[in-house]
From Swiss-Prot:
Its EC number is 7.1.1.-. One of its GO terms (cellular component) is plasma membrane. It is an enzyme of class 7 (translocase). NDH-1 is composed of 14 different subunits. Subunits NuoA, H, J, K, L, M, N constitute the membrane sector of the complex. It is a multi-pass membrane protein. It comes from Salinispora tropica (strain ATCC BAA-916 / DSM 44818 / JCM 13857 / NBRC 105044 / CNB-440). InterPro entries: NADH_UbQ_OxRdtase_chain4L/K (IPR001133), NUOK/Mnh_C1-like (IPR039428). This is NADH-quinone oxidoreductase subunit K.
């Protein structure tokens, strides 16, 4: 019964590649800072999925531990990034990344 529910690791790697591609396309195309952060998070989740998949293939926990640390760093990145976005929005009334260079004035 367990073999019926098991999924090949190749499918996880393909899913991770698709998620990373969607995130990279969003980073390249979009100008809204909040959408950029969401796309970067999507790319980090794709990297985490790849780490966990290779951890499962090799049978060790190192990839899962690394994915955990990536999630912790990503959470800290979101906190700092959203604080910067809020500062930009308060001064410029826009969340566009084009206004980010105006924050120094």
């Amino acid at each position: 019964m367990n073999e019926f529910f098991s999924v090949e690791p190749n499918y996880y790697l393909v899913l991770a590649a698709v998620l990373f591609t969607i995130g990279a396309a969003g980073v390249l195309v979009r100008r809204n800072a909040i959408v950029l952060f969401m796309c970067v998070e999507l790319m980090l989740n794709a990297a985490n999925l790849t780490l966990v998949t290779f951890s499962r293939i090799n049978g060790d926990l190192n990839g899962q531990i690394m994915a955990f640390f990536v999630m912790v760093v990503a959470a800290a990145e979101v906190v700092v990034g959203l604080a910067i976005i809020m500062a930009i929005y308060r001064t410029r009334r826009s969340a566009s990344v084009d206004d980010a260079n105006l924050l120094k004035y």
